[in-house]
């Protein structure tokens, strides 16, 4: 498929998703095939809290959604061993993915001990390559949590090495405390999927869902909605530069 055809295909497939900076294609008819959407998060609950409503919109529009969890959140439950916590949090992640109509994949790193090396760059590249994504979401790399940084940088390195570039977008979590220096380029109106996102986040019972929202996510959704001109929104930063993919003329 030539670059022009790819651009048109993705534009048509984006009908109804609602990115502020992408053209509206509400009049588009059929699409050649569903998009393949992948989200890479450091722990169970990161993709859900960062861009769960956007993932839900993609799934509702008929696109295939996969969530790759870098770890199983092994260090995330005080008083539980790594294996015990991993079992609990994996079950929570699977329940959240079921709500979002997403396929869960657990990459195999360990919460709190994540690494970036050639072996793991290759593993992430292979994971993403097997999914053949059109669009990938991951953490913004400037983050106070090392695991978030690792998930982001492994994804970025995979994108750099990809023979066929996918669109790469970064999401925010607990802005100002974890995600730092985040200046959105794109927004998604999540008014219709905000409640589904909340239900997915609340699947992570072990992580104190009210605390997740108290960390700033309620305010983030409201503030990003104010910026977009809607009741609620999720915000993203788009990868740009020489190596950017050829999907959109923005």
State where each predicted segment sits.
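Divalent metal-coordination and catalytic microenvironments
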Residues: 45, 71, 93, 104, ...
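Glycine-rich phosphate-binding loop and adjoining beta1-alpha1-beta2 segment
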Residues: 75, 80-100
């Amino acid at each position: 498929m030539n670059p022009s055809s790819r651009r048109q295909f993705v534009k048509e497939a984006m009908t109804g998703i609602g990115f502020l900076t992408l053209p509206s294609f509400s009049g588009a008819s059929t699409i050649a095939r569903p998009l393949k959407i992948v989200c890479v998060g450091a722990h169970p609950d990161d993709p859900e809290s960062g861009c769960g409503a956007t993932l839900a919109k993609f799934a509702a529009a008929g696109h295939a959604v996969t969530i790759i969890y870098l770890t199983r959140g092994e260090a995330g439950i005080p008083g539980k061993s790594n294996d015990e916590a991993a079992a609990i949090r994996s079950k929570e992640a699977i329940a959240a993915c079921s709500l979002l109509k997403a396929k869960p994949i657990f990459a195999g790193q360990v919460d709190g001990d994540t690494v970036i090396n050639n072996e793991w760059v290759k593993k992430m590249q292979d994971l993403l390559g097997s999914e053949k994504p059109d669009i990938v979401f991951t953490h913004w790399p400037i983050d106070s949590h090392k695991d978030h940084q690792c998930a982001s940088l492994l994804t970025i390195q995979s994108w750099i090495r990809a023979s066929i570039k996918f669109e790469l977008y970064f999401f925010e979590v607990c802005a100002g405390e974890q995600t730092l220096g985040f200046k959105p380029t794109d927004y998604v109106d999540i008014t219709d999927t905000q409640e589904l996102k909340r239900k997915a986040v609340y699947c992570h019972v072990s992580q104190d869902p009210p605390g997740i929202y108290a960390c700033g996510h309620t305010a983030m959704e409201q503030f990003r909605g104010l910026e977009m001109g809607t009741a609620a929104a999720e915000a993203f930063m788009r990868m740009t530069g020489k190596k950017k993919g050829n999907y959109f003329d923005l």
